[in-house]
Amino acid sequence: MLKIKRTWKTHSRILDKDPFSIEPPRKVIRALYDYTARKATEVSFAKGDFFHVIGRENDKAWYEVCNPAAGTRGFVPVSHFEEIGKTVKSERDSDGSGQISFTDLTTNSSTTRSSISELHSGSQPLFGIVQFDFAAERPDELEAKAGEAIIIIARSNHEWLVAKPIGRLGGPGLIPLSFIQLRDLKTGAVIKDVSEAVLRISCIPRVEDWKRAAADYKKSSIPLGKFSDGETQTMPSLSPSTENLQINNDVTYQAATDNSSTFPGSVANELTPLQTLESRTASIASKNKKDMSSEPTVVAAMVENYMIRDDQYWYLVRAVMSDGKHRNLCRYYEDFFNFQTKFLELFPNEAGRGDERRVIPYMPGPVDDVNELISSQRAMDLDVYLKEMCRLPARLLENELVKLFFLPLDGDVESPHPTSTMPEALPREPLSFSLPEKAPEKATNISIPESAPTTAGSTCKVKVRLGDETFALRVPSDISFEDFCERLTNKLGECEHLSYRDTNANKVLPLNNVDDLRKACSQESGVLLFAERRRF
């Protein structure tokens, strides 16, 4: 594990090497109240936020904490938190025998308890918390420590499961069911009736089904990009511990995974409708081309979670930029796919197509079907992909393709400090990239998708600054003032004191009616709107 440097420029900006790496937590705590930082070394938080205590755990006044999800580090007041972490309670059965029960916590979810009937309402994947240290005695078993989070991939029988670690790199392996506290992947709810849950939830396949998924995935798990005739590409070698995974000495299957990222059946083809990248690029108006030279480069990035909107899965990307700002971005699988395809074409040597060793990381290729279990694993694979991407040489990260991928689009969030504000998943065309005919490493022609197909001049892009955060939305140019306020309320909540920047007069003017709105939208530079959240 990479060690975090103990210095930082601001209270919430970490780190020079890897802002999302953390030291092993000594405690896990949850906020009881809201708190706004008063010094540069403090961290702001809201009620219900979780932190890892990494220092001064016995101090009566201040904890030194790290939030691995948001990438923040600093000091918080002890009086504002309750300690959760991992506890051990000794209970006595009716026969007097001692029984040890363990409780643990998923640090970035609000844990709720639900009945087994609620779990059966949909095909929801499971993850688990390892309750006891498990020492692998065979190559096909999964070495795991108490408190480690794992995702359940398949079931062998009523005693053994196939699982893969979440918080670290590693392939799948066998682990006893009795060593795991199962939880619902989305809600974090503990599944108390383990046997019924494992047998009845359809998203946990049997080993035979997973074997077929492994074979399908192995066929499709190829590096994205084009290869000329006669070119070959070396695939990552299989992990020795998972290359031949044998269950109960009677079922053996090939796991198409290595120790770095992927897992059988973890990706799906979402490129619908089927179009070429060139046709997508040609359909975007040239007025949307953007000069990326002034854009900051990405310092660190992660895929924190996945969501679903209108039957389409999208991924929450958190990024830290070279200017110190934090971005929460909505990205679809097509965005990753299009980016990787063109990135490999733009840098063929770094893609391993010449004599040099490949340095561009692999990402999961498309397969036929998408479900919640596949999307959860894909989120982890893409998380590894982005973290490996951020370790590339600066000349690659400074390329315009990379800058565009992390550029805030309509609905995305940008803030000078880490924020839990979620981006809005707006309907739009996938990110498209077109390569220049000459000097590919110096410039790229990049097209930014619009939220929806519109005619030129029919929409107005509005940036809204609310405190330290900036939001973006696109509205029809002829929208009424009432409808505009309604859309603003739906996105940001009740706001007041609306104003906008008049670029011609170089001053801030009030936005009170439709005439003010029309004047603001007529500016060539777009609209910068200022708002204050209403205080009740």
Curated annotation (Swiss-Prot):
It comes from the Eukaryota. Residues 88-115 are annotated as: Disordered. GO terms for cellular component: Cdc42 GTPase complex; cell division site; cell tip; cortical dynamic polarity patch; cytoplasm; cytosol; mating projection tip; nucleus. The keyword Transferase does not apply. One of its GO terms (biological process) is positive regulation of mating projection assembly. Scd1, scd2, cdc42, and ras1, in its GTP-bound state, act cooperatively to form a protein complex. Residues 24-86, 123-185 form the SH3 domain. GO terms for molecular function: phosphatidylinositol binding; protein-macromolecule adaptor activity. Residues 459-533 form the PB1 domain. SUPFAM superfamilies: CAD & PB1 domains, PX domain, SH3-domain. CDD domains: PB1, PX_Bem1p, SH3_Bem1p_1, SH3_Bem1p_2. Residues 101-115 have a biased composition (Low complexity). Required for mating and morphogenesis. Interacts directly with scd1 and with cdc42. May bridge and facilitate scd1 and cdc42 interactions. This is Protein scd2/ral3. The keyword Repeat applies. Residues 293-413 form the PX domain. Keywords: Repeat, SH3 domain.
